[in-house]
Amino acid sequence: MTTQHPDTPETGITPGGTSGAFRDVLSKDHARRGKPPLHFVDMTPEQRVEKAAELGLPKFRVKQLANHYFGHFDVNAAEFTDFPAAKRSEAAAAFFPQLITEVTRQVADEGTTIKTLWKLFDGSLIESVLMRYPTRTTLCISSQVGCGMDCPFCATGKLGLTRNMSTGEIIEQVRVAAKMMRDGEVAGGEGRLSNIVFMGMGEPMGNYNSVLSAVRQISAMPPEGFGISARNITVSTVGVVPGIKKLTAEGIPVRLAVSLHAPSDELRDELVPMNKRFNTKQVLDAAHDYWLASKRRVSIEYALMRGINDQAEHAQLLAKRLNHYGDNWAHVNPIPLNPIEGSKWTASKPEDEQRFLEILHRAGITATLRDTRGQDIDGACGQLAAKER
C-alpha cells in the first residue's frame, strides 16, 4: 500500500483519460483529427477474431498473424507463407495498415546512433532514436505528436501538442527498430533490441492508455508481444502526479523516470511549467511511493544549465530533498544540456558538472552523468523537433 501525502491531489487521470482542468494542460493546442487506422495491436483479442471472421479466416490464423508481427517483425504479405495465397494481401491490409512512413534517417556515433523521422497517416511528424551500446541497444520512442508541457529548454516543448499517438503508432517504432537490429542494419552487426525508453516526443502520462497498452505488448512474450522485459522499459514524466499514481497501481515493474531539472519550486516553476500544477513535493512524494510499491529505483533526470540550476547550492538542496525519503530509492542522471536553435539556455561548464556530481556522491546519492548520444544530428535529449531536412 502506498503512503498517502496530504498535499497530493487525488483527482486527475481516469480510466478514460484525463478529467477536469487537468485535461487542458495535457491537451494544450490539441486539434481534433481523424483517428489512425485500426492496427492489430490496437485491437482486443476478440476484435482480432471478429476481423479474421470477416475475412473468412478461422481463429487460429490470428495467432499466426501475431507470431509474424511480434516474433518475426513481419507485416509484408509476401512473408505470410503459412497463409492461403489468396488471403495474404487482404489479411496484411486489414491487420497491418501502414501507420508510420520513414522520411529521413540520420546516423551518428560511427553508425551506432540512428535518428528516424516518421510521417504518420495524417502528415504529422515524429522521431525515434536508436542507440547501440556495447552491452545493450536502446530505442527512445515518441508517444505524442509534439508536447504540451512547454519546457523552455526543450525543442519538442516549443512545438506544442498536436495529438496523442495510437498504440499502433507507438509500437510500430519498436517493431521497425527490432527488425533493423535483427537484420544487421545498425553498426556492429546483427543484434537484439533490449531496452525501450519513453523519452522521445511527448509526455507519456498525457497519453496514458495508449502508452500502457504499448508497454504491455512490448513486454509480453511472443506471440503476444516482443518479449522485452518490463524491467528494461522506462516511462518518463515531467511530474504528472495522477499518472505516476496510476502507474504505481498497475504493478508493472517498469522504471519510472522523473524530469525534475530543479530542486526548488521557484526555479522549477520557470523550467517545468507543470510544476505550477504539481509541485516538487507532490512529484517526489508520488515518485517515492512508486519505489515503495515496485522496489524499482526511480531515475531523476536533471538537465544541467549554466548558471541556472548547476551550482553547489542546487546540488545540495537536491540531495537534501532526495535523502528526506531515505537511502537508495532514486538515481540522479545529470544531463549536459543539449543545444537547441534559438535557446538562451546553455550547457554547464565541465567543472560545474563534475562539482554537481561530487556533491551528490558525498551526500550518498547515486548519480551518473548522462551520455549525450546523437547531439550532432539533433537526436539527443531535448532536441527532437521532427523537422524535415
Swiss-Prot record:
Q: Where in the cell is it found?
A: Cytoplasm
**Enzyme Commission numbers on file:** 2.1.1.192
UniProt KW keywords: 4Fe-4S, Cytoplasm, Disulfide bond, Iron, Iron-sulfur, Metal-binding, Methyltransferase, rRNA processing, S-adenosyl-L-methionine, Transferase, tRNA processing
One Gene Ontology term of the molecular function aspect: rRNA binding
The entry's free-text remark on the cofactor is: Binds 1 [4Fe-4S] cluster. The cluster is coordinated with 3 cysteines and an exchangeable S-adenosyl-L-methionine.
User: Which biological process terms from the Gene Ontology are attached to this UniProt entry?
Assistant: rRNA base methylation; tRNA methylation
Q: What does the record give as cofactor?
A: [4Fe-4S] cluster
Provide the residue positions that the database annotates as binding S-adenosyl-L-methionine.
202-203, 236, 259-261, 338
Give residue ranges for domain Radical SAM core. Answer: 133-376
| Residues covered by region (Disordered) | 1-23
Identify which residues the record assigns to the active site. 127, 381
User: Pfam families, per this entry?
Assistant: Radical_SAM
- Which Gene3D superfamilies does the UniProt entry name for this protein? Aldolase class I
Query: Which CDD domains does the UniProt entry name for this protein?
Result: Radical_SAM
Positions that bind [4Fe-4S] cluster? 147, 151, 154
| Disulfide pattern | 140-381
Q: Which GO terms describe its cellular component?
A: cytoplasm
* Catalytic reaction(s) noted: adenosine(2503) in 23S rRNA + 2 reduced [2Fe-2S]-[ferredoxin] + 2 S-adenosyl-L-methionine = 2-methyladenosine(2503) in 23S rRNA + 5'-deoxyadenosine + L-methionine + 2 oxidized [2Fe-2S]-[ferredoxin] + S-adenosyl-L-homocysteine; adenosine(37) in tRNA + 2 reduced [2Fe-2S]-[ferredoxin] + 2 S-adenosyl-L-methionine = 2-methyladenosine(37) in tRNA + 5'-deoxyadenosine + L-methionine + 2 oxidized [2Fe-2S]-[ferredoxin] + S-adenosyl-L-homocysteine
Purpose of the protein: Specifically methylates position 2 of adenine 2503 in 23S rRNA and position 2 of adenine 37 in tRNAs.
Mind telling me which HAMAP family this protein's record contains? RNA_methyltr_RlmN
> Which family, according to UniProt?
Belongs to the radical SAM superfamily. RlmN family.
Give the note: Reaction proceeds by a ping-pong mechanism involving intermediate methylation of a conserved cysteine residue.
Protein's recorded name: Probable dual-specificity RNA methyltransferase RlmN
**Native source organism of the sequence:** Bifidobacterium longum (strain NCC 2705)
User: Per UniProt, what is the name of the gene that codes for the protein in this document?
Assistant: rlmN
